[in-house]
Amino acid sequence: MSAVRSKICGITRIEDALAAVEAGADAIGFVFYAKSPRAVTVQQARSIIAALPPFVTTVGLFVNASRCELGEILDAVPLDLLQFHGDETAAECEGWHRPYIKALRVKAGDNIAAACDAYPSASGVLLDTYVEGVPGGTGEAFDWSLIPQGLSKPLILAGGLTPENVADAIARVRPYAVDVSGGVEASKGIKDHAKIRAFINAVR
């Protein structure tokens, strides 16, 4: 099995982004969703990205953003990858001249394979915990046994991951990548650098 990639999401400060990169994170995530306690402004994201070394993937997370809002952000912020975390259709995720991943919130009874197949142009699917009315970042894990084998897209596992459980999650799910936000925080939007290091070390 090739090395599992890691993304640290919900970055709001330069020092947290640099700590994640130094620890070995492959990607840094920025939340462009005003209702999130981890939301960043265009200027915040631009400043953080400008401080990053090369070969770090920058990801923008969006939740049911309008085409106008999304276009304005993409014109201003150099994002490598888009992550759609709302009810966006495949057509709404396409056409931005950037690869995208689609987040799917998992609950018992879902046909995850069919949901994955509904986004044929996606670079991957991110599986997160379903909580009513909350698009993501809940800090809660879901039942990994619900994930079917042989999904048509690379699988990014999210939802309640921590330095303590991520190695077990990888062994059981065998994802392409793991995504963490709350599991490496001191408080919402503020990362704990020791937890980031512990998480990345556990992924390896």
Swiss-Prot record:
InterPro entries: Aldolase_TIM, PRAI_dom, RibuloseP-bd_barrel, TrpF_fam
Keyword Isomerase part of the UniProt annotation: yes
Top-level taxon in the UniProt lineage: Bacteria
Keyword Mitochondrion found: no
Catalytic activity field: N-(5-phospho-beta-D-ribosyl)anthranilate = 1-(2-carboxyphenylamino)-1-deoxy-D-ribulose 5-phosphate
Principal EC category: isomerase
GO BP annotations listed: L-tryptophan biosynthetic process
One Gene Ontology term of the molecular function aspect: phosphoribosylanthranilate isomerase activity
Recorded family membership: Belongs to the TrpF family.
Entry-linked PANTHER family: N-(5'-PHOSPHORIBOSYL)ANTHRANILATE ISOMERASE
The protein's name: N-(5'-phosphoribosyl)anthranilate isomerase
Native organism taxonomy: Bacteria, Pseudomonadati, Pseudomonadota, Gammaproteobacteria, Pseudomonadales
